[in-house]
């Protein structure tokens, strides 16, 4: 069973369910059981295993994953972001939820996952999420977070200088401000 405390059994169950899904078998009962396991467990690892399996068999749609982005457990919220990003292009409602989370969620893993999601957005759509992420200085000294934000907005900086300048004006992460200023100055020198 996916809910087994023994990781080997759980992994074998997930693999078998995924193989059946790939073979086109009807997994309605399995999906219901997985959903039940997800809802009833107090174990975060078990909930994640159920979530991953539901996603692998196509039973974790956008609406369900967006609901999970409100879960009290940081790892569940983080994985809901990751799985939403693994789907097709991010919808407007998913982007809005990411912006809300960027501004309000204080969990480090969630913030890192959102910063990494920047790279999956079209250039013009990156600014609202980037603004939300840099509006607080909680992770300013983190060795990874400022770089992830920068990697996400770097290609957009020269495409929209005004948005970049607005971001610099309200940015509370010195390293991101420095990178943007350096990039804009470098581009200005080429003109």
Q: Where does each model-flagged region fall?
A:
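Long, ordered, helix-rich scaffold segments
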Residues: 1-191
């Amino acid at each position: 069973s996916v809910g087994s405390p023994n990781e080997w059994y759980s992994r074998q169950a997930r693999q078998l369910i995924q193989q059946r899904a790939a073979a086109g078998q009807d997994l309605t009962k399995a999906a219901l059981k997985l959903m039940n396991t997800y809802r009833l467990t107090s174990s975060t690892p078990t909930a994640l295993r159920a979530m991953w399996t539901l996603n692998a068999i196509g039973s974790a749609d956008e609406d369900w994953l967006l609901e999970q982005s409100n879960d009290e457990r940081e790892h569940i919220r983080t994985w809901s972001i990751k799985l939403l990003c693994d789907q097709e292009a991010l919808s407007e409602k998913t982007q809005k939820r990411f912006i809300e989370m960027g501004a309000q969620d204080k969990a480090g893993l969630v913030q890192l996952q959102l910063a990494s999601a920047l790279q999956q957005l079209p250039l013009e759509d990156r600014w609202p999420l980037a603004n939300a992420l840099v509006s607080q200085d909680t992770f300013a000294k983190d060795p990874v977070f400022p770089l992830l934000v920068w990697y996400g907005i770097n290609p957009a900086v020269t495409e929209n200088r005004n948005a970049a300048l607005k971001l610099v004006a309200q940015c509370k992460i010195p390293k991101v401000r420095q990178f943007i200023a350096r990039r804009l100055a470098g581009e200005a020198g080429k003109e």
